[in-house]
């Protein structure tokens, strides 16, 4: 047991409270720090007392950096409202990017009766996914998108110019301190430049085009602290591959991440490393990956401004860098850079000691499998194809790292660049034309071509399983891209690994999974140090008065919250003044029999088969028939109209297909209850007027009662959702117990979208009004 100081009474007497010992630092456990790092002299100092009072008042609405940025782009807020995690807000993002899916979005846009863009300056269109496809059908789609963009006066980038996310960053559309969205899951990339980048779905995009806004629920925010210094031979790709594999229990699923660290630590992560890390926070399960507005970012921005001012960014394709990157704008940006408030609340805190990291490889066929390169090298894994492609790792610096592998080998080969290994095919595609031109100017692009690499146009290509060079059955591939799940880059019978550009190049050169040998482990190294908390050892923590008191307040808040949870009744169903307003046309109560599908991570392909996804005009009856058929072919006959579907955790993960929601509506299921939802499924559900609730307790109770697993089960239980009271009532069979449980509030602005029949109809109604 240890003593902690607690304030008591109006005069703030200090009393001692006996609490259990808590480890100050251990992996995957709380590392909240004890009160003994607040010295009594600090508490007795009159100036400290005044500071203590000011800190109390300033902590009324402390916000994370994510919340601060969202606050800037939230519209229609009540006066004095400070947004926080969990809030449903209407957002008017700084920019929105669509790519090859621009035409389906345009069809939605026109179907709701929209005739002009709300704000053409808000919109950017890029063609990047299927750029190798020269069929007339695809070229016609590309022409339609370009004509539509010209008609509405929006920024347009043609096929071959580069990958949309790279364009958004290099052209300055993703700008520090802004909220930027895209109809693509790797919108997280923009977090590298201190922009909250997050994905939306096509209906959202049509809504923003037409009205300038859509809805968003602010995710829980996780703080990830980097400590130490990234060693030579270790890259940003190794950092994010390690994070995905070492924190592999959905630690940040559906969270917004804020990366932080000391100035020295963050200097060891250059901008291209940050772009890689932010990009793959998507694979880690997060909805955004935000880096701070710091000196590294400022230096990069000023470099872009200088390059643009000198005209060095000019080339065969247009660039807006000279307009968007200017030294006065950058200086103004950093006069008062946005930072998280002291006392901001985070849903969780994790840390990774960069100095203990070595080169890592992801796979095969899963980002949750991360293995030190050294272990895989010992296995002599033959490689058939290598890929230096994608918005993750195909910038000029990445191409330079890959070229250095061959240049180093050339020094041992009489100056002659060696060829890639027999039987290996090596594909390269720059993230954008400016990046390729920079690589050509340095001679790095030519080095890779001389080694035998096959150049592909700037675009997504093999990363998403399109075009030349896909993996065949039985083949092994190593890629610098971001996803390696089975079948992503070709055959489901192939094995795909992910690694840094130098690992890709070294593997292409040797013919087996290997690295260039640039990394040397430090003396005494044993393992990667990571865990919960901020990872700073107490003996290294120097606290001034303000830091100490700020820490104390945070600990008091946590202690009070823990006490409230510990001594509060198990269920507190009704609170005075806590009733939710019900929007006209939205049901006050929803009730039905529970059908239970006892499975976690049911993806959208399990809900609505891919075979039907790209077939137009599928009858509603057919959608109902195939709903959940990839999960359980008996679902169609077991589930009935009006049933309430209860499922496990992370329901609706995977692709962004809207039919995963509309097929359940076709089956006439009004409400889905889960332990948790995949974020994109949640968006599609609300956008298509399918109601959903997250109730982990109900999932646990069903699993307790029905231990013998069935894919789909009629339970005989009933669920009634009281929308006004934000509670559910469960009747466990005719003669079983009845219990109630509080659920998250569904606010009127979201009810309105559902009551109108979905976001498209809501937008149409808004346009007509």
Swiss-Prot record:
Q: What is this enzyme's catalytic activity, as reactions?
A: (2R,3S)-homoisocitrate = cis-homoaconitate + H2O
This protein's pathway reads:
Amino-acid biosynthesis; L-lysine biosynthesis via AAA pathway; L-alpha-aminoadipate from 2-oxoglutarate: step 3/5
For this protein, the Enzyme Commission number is 4.2.1.36
This entry carries the following GO cellular component terms, namely: mitochondrial matrix
A Pfam family of the record is Aconitase_C
Binding residues for [4Fe-4S] cluster: 391, 460, 463
Give the UniProt record's GO annotations in the biological process aspect.
lysine biosynthetic process via aminoadipic acid
A GO molecular function term, named singly, is: 4 iron, 4 sulfur cluster binding
What the protein does comes down to:
Catalyzes the reversible hydration of cis-homoaconitate to (2R,3S)-homoisocitrate, a step in the alpha-aminoadipate pathway for lysine biosynthesis.
Q: What is this protein called?
A: Homoaconitase, mitochondrial
**Which species is the source of this protein?**
Aspergillus niger (strain ATCC MYA-4892 / CBS 513.88 / FGSC A1513)
What taxonomic lineage is listed for the species of origin? Eukaryota, Fungi, Dikarya, Ascomycota, Pezizomycotina
User: What's the gene?
Assistant: lysA
